[in-house]
């Protein structure tokens, strides 16, 4: 969750408290991901706590709807509620209550921030809109991943780095995403300046059944199995999205982009998402990870 300080969490020592007493400000987020093989009742579930007494005291209800061609959806900034822009509606959207839809697709998030130069100030889609549109449009966790990837590719991603928890009745996925910054380029056809790096880089990993996971405002994906067309695929392989053996999905140019930006210069097999895009600092290592 984004807070106004852009910090996942903070600590201070209190003058009148006992020595070494720490107080943790609770403007932060924590998610836990539990697969059906690890739960008592055999169900998948995720938790999404904003760790704050002033946020998310209500649930929003969006009814299912059919849309005529040309219908547009307003994109509101999650932090300010300002209108960011508009995108076309699909033919049908699903009912959503809070962060779960009628198909039992559920989402949660925590903000890890990452390299600030990778925020696209002109990116239309912020992290909140990305979550709600994924819920409105998806019938499974895997479909939600594709929808999120397609939306930021087409319209740009305008938020900090995020970790998403994505679940349905059968699977639980863990996804990390960060923008590609803003590189202005003049487009002759449009007669306008565009972002040559519009979009985002991301990795999604399925949590094995019988396991649990968690995240709390720190990027946790390091190295991962690279594309083999079976266990691991990229966005160039969407036709294989629903193959049961697929456990990893990632943006096809993620390593090339990191090299171009100077974030990584090793062998492909050694590529580390967190080290490249959100290097661990004190807060992430000692305070954010402490919560999970």
Regions found by a protein language model. Give the residues of each.
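Acidic/polar hotspots within intrinsically disordered regions
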Residues: 2-3, 11
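Intrinsic-disorder-associated, low-complexity terminal segments enriched in Asp/Asn/His/Tyr and depleted
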Residues: 4-6, 18
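A contiguous strand-loop segment
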Residues: 25-127, 147-292
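Aromatic (phenylalanine/tyrosine) cluster motif
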Residues: 11, 23-25
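Secreted/luminal cysteine- and crosslink-motif detector
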Residues: 8-10, 289
